[in-house]
């Protein structure tokens, strides 16, 4: 499961739909001001994935996180934060379903969402 926390770019949202489709994820939760289908710019980049990936809209990201946790999900924010686990060291031997929260392109994942998450995963990058 993927949770998008106030993503501003329609193209980024569409790319996540395509990735979710490719990995056969259980679904996506779009939160805050994250653009939602149907929209021409999302449809063009998503290439039909908005039809094959289940998605929901929840205004408040923290509500979405707490809802999934109440259903037994382990929730991890993808963010550089104190105590983050490098992706290469992340243990994926969970018996519970997993949800990843991706944050705004500038601000990242909201601090209250990080606090409510079961942890943070950091994806090392060579670029900026």
Regions found by a protein language model. Name each.
Residues 1-128:
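Post-transcriptional modification and biogenesis factors for structured RNAs
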């Amino acid at each position: 499961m993927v949770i998008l926390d106030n993503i501003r770019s329609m193209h980024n949202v569409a790319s996540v739909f395509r990735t979710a489709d490719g990995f056969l994820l259980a679904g996506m939760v779009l939160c805050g001001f994250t653009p939602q289908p149907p929209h021409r710019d999302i449809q063009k980049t998503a290439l039909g994935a908005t039809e094959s990936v289940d998605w929901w809209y929840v205004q408040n990201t923290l509500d979405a996180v707490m809802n999934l946790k109440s259903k037994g999900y382990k929730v991890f924010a993808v963010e550089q934060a104190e105590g983050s686990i490098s992706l290469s060291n992340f243990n994926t031997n969970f018996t519970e379903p997993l949800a990843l929260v991706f944050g705004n392109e500038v601000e990242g994942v909201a601090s209250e969402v990080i606090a409510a998450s079961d942890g943070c995963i950091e994806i090392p990058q060579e670029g900026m």
